[in-house]
Swiss-Prot record:
Residues 216-377 form the TrmE-type G domain. Homodimer. Heterotetramer of two MnmE and two MnmG subunits. This is tRNA modification GTPase MnmE. Keywords: Cytoplasm, GTP-binding, Hydrolase, Magnesium, Metal-binding, Nucleotide-binding, Potassium, tRNA processing. It comes from Yersinia enterocolitica serotype O:8 / biotype 1B (strain NCTC 13174 / 8081).
Length: 454
């Protein structure tokens, strides 16, 4: 669709509400104002006016705001009509506007997309709008605001600027090889490169924290029937989310709970007990359990402490460990410490974490929560932090790889041309985060996930 069309959409959630807002952006915004309001409101002043139908009858009355471009959210002429939040009224007003020539319904995220295309926002800031709307905790919301205000973008621009300066220095060394000073081997370029790499690593650390705030951690509780998996889910959730009985195989399907640990979203999944299925329903539940296990960030291997003294996962259940993906982190949870009398606590056993607790009494649950937070490297101190998406982490990782390869070319062979190319590729990867270098396909995928009115 053309970006020169004038677009309109409801900017408030669908359904009944005290206020409903329609947003118009584009060249015909002033025409819409004249047709619906009978006048063009004074720019950036709230005007209380009737909203007129084509025959002059009043559809609604409310506040009109007019923002001439380029001093608007999208950089275009923008008109906002704030009326009553009834769906019928808003639909009538929307139809009235769409009947005017040159108007069409906005695509999801098109207002933010136009703001990006008109240099009102960079891509990271535009994404922060959607992240702010979707924030599930206070920390996530504050970090999204920081990103919207440019905290993440500033860090990326600083890295890009440092790489630009370094590239100029390297290119000069390549173009003037006859100079008395060998810029490639005198240590100055390596020192600057090491500085950029250190700064990038710091940004990656902060971005991982931002990603955890946004994406959270997926934890799957797995084990044999009657090990206490559902009791652990209830203890972590702080409510009776799952049915708990003494009958083995009570849980037949996947149960999901979403909680927060100091602002980090935790997606807890309780699964059917793993064993030879006794019927088709249980077989399907066990298949779903393994599907969730394979996609987890961490598995809580639930063990009934009254049935074994073993603490090594392979000794407890070798078949289970053999099927687990080799890189999947697990924590062995020895349950029923209130019965066995085991000392509550967390230890390390041959590279695996082992925690002793009682899901029934809740003893040791806080220790498990802290363990999950620390295992992901999450810190609750997000002052000045920013949110990050998976694509941001991938771009930062790619940039780090190019810088590492460039460093290798420099110290092993003083290969200026190869170093310059790696610096260029690293800079390109970083520029994808803010949208200075992005494909149309990437932009389409990002903005299509936004709300219609954004």
């Amino acid at each position: 669709m053309s970006t020169t069309d004038t677009i309109v959409a409801q900017a408030t959630p669908p359904g009944r509400g005290g206020v409903g807002i329609l947003r118009v952006s584009g060249r015909a915004a002033a025409t819409v104002a004249q047709a619906v309001l009978g006048k063009l409101p004074k720019p950036r002043y709230a005007d209380y006016l009737p909203f007129k139908d084509v025959d002059g009858s009043t559809l609604d009355q409310g506040i009109a705001l007019y923002f001439p471009g380029p001093n608007s959210f999208t950089g275009e002429d923008v008109l906002e009509l704030q009326g009553h939040g009834g769906p019928v009224i808003l639909d009538l007003l929307l139809k009235r506007i769409l009947a005017l020539p040159g108007l069409r319904i906005a695509r999801p995220g098109e207002f933010s997309e136009r703001a990006f295309l008109n240099d009102k926002l960079d891509l990271a800031q535009a994404e922060a709008i959607a992240d702010l709307i979707d924030a599930s905790s206070e920390q996530a919301a504050r970090s999204a605001v920081n990103s919207l205000q440019g905290a993440f973008s500033v860090r990326i621009h600083q890295l890009v600027e440092a790489l630009t300066h370094l590239r100029i220095y390297v290119e000069a060394a390549i173009d003037f090889p006859d100079e008395e000073i060998d810029f490639l081997s005198d240590g100055k370029i390596e020192g600057q490169l090491n500085g950029v790499m250190a700064d990038l690593e710091q940004v990656r650390t902060e971005a991982r924290q931002g990603s955890l705030l946004r994406e959270g951690m997926k934890v799957v509780i797995a084990g044999r029937p009657n090990a206490g998996k559902s009791s652990l889910l209830n203890a972590l959730a702080g409510r009776e989310a799952a049915i708990v009985t003494d009958i083995a195989g009570t849980t037949r399907d996947v149960l999901r709970e979403h909680i927060h640990i100091d602002g980090m979203p935790l997606h807890i999944i309780d699964t059917a007990g793993l064993r030879e299925a006794s019927d088709e329903v249980e077989r399907i539940g066990i298949e779903r359990a393994w599907h969730e296990i394979e996609q987890a960030d961490r598995v809580l291997f639930m063990v009934d402490g009254t049935t074994t003294d073993a603490t090594e996962p392979a000794a407890i259940w070798p078949e289970f460990m053999a099927r687990l993906p080799a890189t999947l982190p697990i924590t062995v949870v020895r349950n029923k410490a209130d019965i066995t009398g085991e000392t509550l606590g967390l230890t390390e056993v041959n590279g695996h974490s082992l925690i002793r607790l009682s899901a029934r009494t809740g003893e040791g649950i806080d220790l498990l929560r802290n363990h999950l937070k620390q295992s992901m490297g999450f810190t609750s101190n997000t002052e000045g932090g920013f949110l990050a998406r998976r694509r941001h982490l991938q771009a930062l990782e790619t940039a780090a790889q190019h810088l590492a390869q460039g460093h290798e070319q420099l110290v092993s062979a003083y290969a200026g041309e190869l170093l310059a190319e790696e610096l260029r590729l690293a800079q390109q990867s970083l520029s994808e985060i803010t949208g200075e270098f992005s494909s149309d396909d990437l932009l389409g995928r990002i903005f299509s996930s936004f709300c219609i009115g954004k």
